[in-house]
């Protein structure tokens, strides 16, 4: 399972996030998108060497996140189960084999010319 898919399942969980600049953010996840952009509510943001600031909501760009600190009570076994539907691969007909060698109609060096621009074949 991809990390982002796991994080997308963490809605309504309270986590601590550390950013690359050292800022720590504690809040409840409202959503995570495929770019790992994270949206939080009831946020306490502690910028390095400053007093904490309380915010109602906060959105964090995914590439600024260093790591997530998850609560110990989180049921990781159930969250890590990959429940995304698998795409079915199309089966080819067993009697017919395609795309083997150049065969008729091959393009490129030495292949048949095709219809072209109306040059007379054999005349010069």
From Swiss-Prot:
UniProt keyword terms in alphabetical order: Cytoplasm, Methylation, mRNA processing, mRNA splicing, Nucleus, Repeat, Ribonucleoprotein, Spliceosome
GO CC annotations, alphabetized: catalytic step 2 spliceosome; commitment complex; cytosol; nucleus; pICln-Sm protein complex; precatalytic spliceosome; small nuclear ribonucleoprotein complex; SMN-Sm protein complex
Domain (Sm): residue spans on this chain: 2-74
Post-translational modification remark: Methylated on arginine residues by Art5 and Art7; methylation is not required for assembly and biogenesis of snRNPs.
Sequence repeats: 100-101, 102-103, 104-105, 107-108, 109-110, 111-112, 113-114, 115-116, 117-118
Pfam families with a match to the protein in the record: LSM
Keyword Nucleus among UniProt keywords: yes
Source species, domain of life: Eukaryota
Primary localization class, coarse: nucleus
Basic residues: bias regions: 87-124
Spans annotated as 9 X 2 AA approximate tandem repeats of R-G: 100-118
GO BP of this protein: mRNA splicing, via spliceosome; spliceosomal snRNP assembly
GO molecular function term, any single one: RNA binding
PROSITE patterns in alphabetical order: SM
Chain positions covered by the region annotation Disordered: 81-124
Subunit note: Interacts with the SMN complex.
Protein's job: Plays a role in pre-mRNA splicing as a core component of the spliceosomal U1, U2, U4 and U5 small nuclear ribonucleoproteins (snRNPs), the building blocks of the spliceosome.
Family: Belongs to the snRNP core protein family.
Protein name, UniProt field: Probable small nuclear ribonucleoprotein Sm D1
Source organism: Drosophila melanogaster
């Amino acid at each position: 399972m991809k990390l982002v898919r796991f994080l997308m399942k963490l809605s309504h969980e309270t986590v601590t996030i550390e950013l690359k600049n050292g800022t720590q953010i504690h809040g409840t996840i409202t959503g995570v998108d495929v770019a790992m952009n994270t949206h939080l509510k009831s946020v306490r943001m502690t910028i390095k060497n400053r007093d904490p600031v309380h915010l109602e909501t906060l959105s964090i760009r995914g590439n600024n996140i260093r790591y997530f600190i998850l609560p110990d009570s989180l049921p990781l076994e159930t969250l890590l189960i990959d429940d995304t539907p698998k795409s079915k691969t199309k089966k080819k007909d067993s009697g017919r084999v395609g795309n083997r060698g150049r065969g008729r109609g091959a393009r490129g060096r030495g292949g048949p010319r095709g219809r072209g621009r109306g040059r007379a074949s054999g005349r010069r």
